[in-house]
Amino acid sequence: MSNDIEFRKLEHLFVCNYCDVEYKKGTLLEDVELIHSGISNCDLEDIDTSINLFGKNLGAPIIVAAITGGHSKAKEINKNIAIAIDELNLGMGVGSQRAALINEELMETYSVVRDYTSSLVLGNLGAVNFIEDGWDEETIHKAVEMIDADGMAIHFNPLQEAIQPEGDYNFKGIEILKDIMENYNKTYNNKSNKKIPFIAKQVGEGFSKEDALLLNGLGFDSIDVGGSGGTSWAAVEYYRIKDEESKKFSKKYLEWGIPTAASILEVKQNFDKPIIATGGIRSGMDIAKSMAIGAQCCGVALPVLKAALRGSEDVIKLIENYIEELKTTMFLMGCDNVNELMNSRYIIKNELKEWI
């Protein structure tokens, strides 16, 4: 099984880099109008983009969203990302750690990040595996120890699992996560005196307000909305499928999901803890819009993956451009800091207006 997972990780990297896997429909952030300040009353050079997330100070509200791990090629990618986030004082998440839990030889493809950064690093485990594979608090402990994680993302990916040839389909009984997360912090927080925040993470399909209510009840500390508009994992799996009938079936779901902006607005109705916006974040203005409507931080994945394949310097340049654009947008809105941005006025129009 470990070889199958390792090969699948490599296929995912190849498809994401060389195939068209992005949604054709947008994030609906284009339907968010930020309010220009004709006066500004700010000094562009003094704009403060820093935030505190999960007890870590970040230079900007940006994390490199979970991308990869579990293959030798992934080690170099995670290394390049870690170098970049350390340079810029940002955060990152690793890809699903299941491969390394099955095959310990793959652990270094994840743990390499701690050779290059002490910044915020989030672990990653699949929600479905707690049901299908009987994972528990000990599994979480192993994943945390593997990368000295500052938080643990539990990802929900029903669409990908439904289309993936090797998919796990049983998400029934996800309520078991409540006891598992509580037991983890009771057992291991006492030993390390380090409470691990748990993040419910979508991977491109988005969460609804009903989802947010359930996740809040389960005790999650944060929600990463992972809305549609960026990478479509249905598209990624479409390119992997060999059978033509299965391809036709999967093609119907290439545009499925709640757009990122809509998911932010949905989730914040029933969740008052940190919201992370991922899914089609492609500019500093996207970050500003996401935070104005309810996010506390944003994540970027696919553009960083492509840059990381070239090297850490390309990752740094890419994210520096995002930060510069974010600062300029805040300056034009008259926002000196992120708190002011998060409390700024905005206008919702067109299709996004139908979600509120």
UniProtKB/Swiss-Prot annotation:
GO terms for cellular component: cytoplasm. One of its GO terms (molecular function) is isopentenyl-diphosphate delta-isomerase activity. The keyword Metal-binding applies. Mg(2+) binds at residue 161. Its EC number is 5.3.3.2. Substrate binds at residues 8-9, 96-98, 160. Keywords: Cytoplasm, Flavoprotein, FMN, Isomerase, Isoprene biosynthesis, Magnesium, Metal-binding, NADP. It is found in: Cytoplasm. The keyword Flavoprotein applies. It catalyses: isopentenyl diphosphate = dimethylallyl diphosphate. Its cofactor is FMN; NADPH; Mg(2+). GO terms for biological process: isoprenoid biosynthetic process. InterPro entries: Aldolase_TIM, FMN-dep_DH, IPdP_isomerase. FMN binds at residues 66-68, 96, 124, 201, 231, 280-282, 301-302. Homooctamer. Dimer of tetramers. HAMAP family: Idi_2. Involved in the biosynthesis of isoprenoids. Catalyzes the 1,3-allylic rearrangement of the homoallylic substrate isopentenyl (IPP) to its allylic isomer, dimethylallyl diphosphate (DMAPP). Belongs to the IPP isomerase type 2 family. This is Isopentenyl-diphosphate delta-isomerase.
